[in-house]
Regions:
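Beta-propeller-forming repeat regions
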Residues: 4-261
Length: 261
């Protein structure tokens, strides 16, 4: 993992601020070629060009899922923008990303991108672009969230791993170096057949991902990752989860040295 810090950016709070700015500030036309803040679905900052300089990656668009009981109402975009990272701190005040700050604009309408992250998943020392997409797969002909990983080479996305799915359908996943070995793992919130949820940890194994361990079933509705509480990495990894139906907060502890969850 090189010159990277994915800030696990949980976008909603920042996007709410952007929306309020759009509503209450005097409206001026968005400059030609710029991208409105209201069209930002997801963003993160990380070095994806292996030059030691971070970029701002943005999913932009206006789609909304309507045909999925688990993901109904969630947004997806049409474009991946690779931008000057200096603009990240000004997104809420500017109301848009200036055209001159956009290095590349990549059309991803065909795979309905929902979330973008950056991390080194295979230990090659280069950060991959992780995109959660909403689409069918060759051997799984239903619309579902799927984790896709790419290298960014001269403005083009080169596939690294286009997984049909994880072990189970998932609500969300983040990249996090759970065992502090310099390589990022997938941490996902997944559906059980009984309607419950578990948190599962995956690591890269040659040509794909393998489950390291998982939590016991979580008790509570709509768990989500807690980005406000620091997570711990190492032989003992700690991951925080919040629930939408209460102020309940769970700190999950994984003993990775003994491979026990």
């Amino acid at each position: 993992m090189k010159n990277r810090r994915l800030v696990i950016i949980f976008v909603p709070a920042l996007l709410v601020l952007a929306a309020l700015a759009v509503i209450f500030w005097p409206q001026e036309p968005i400059p030609e070629g710029a991208v409105s803040a209201r069209d930002i679905v997801s963003f993160c900052v990380g070095d994806v060009t292996d030059d030691g300089v971070p970029e701002l990656l943005v999913i932009s668009g206006s789609g909304k899922i309507t045909d999925d009981d688990f993901a109904a109402g969630e947004r997806y975009g049409q474009l991946l923008l690779v931008c000057d990272a200096s603009i990240a701190r000004d997104l809420t005040s500017l109301r848009y990303i200036p055209a001159e700050k956009i290095y590349y604009s990549i059309d991803l309408a065909g795979i309905k991108p929902m979330k973008v992250q950056v991390g080194d998943i295979n230990g090659d020392g280069i950060n991959e672009v992780a995109i959660c997409v909403y689409k069918t797969a060759k051997f799984h002909e239903v619309m579902a969230k799927r984790p896709f990983f790419f290298d960014l080479v001269e403005g083009n996305l080169i596939p690294v791993w286009l997984g049909s799915r994880l072990s189970r359908p998932f609500d969300d996943y983040v990249l996090f170096d759970v065992n502090a070995d310099g390589v990022d793992e997938i941490v996902s919130i997944e559906h059980l057949e009984n309607g419950g949820r578990v948190v599962a940890l995956y690591e890269w194994k040659g040509f794909g991902f393998e489950v390291i361990t998982q939590s016991e079933e979580l008790e509570g509705k709509k768990p989500r990752f807690d980005s406000e509480t620091p997570w711990a990495a190492g032989d003992i990894a700690e991951i925080s989860v919040l629930f939408s139906d209460s102020t309940k907060h769970v700190r999950l502890i994984f003993n990775l040295k003994k491979n026990e969850g």
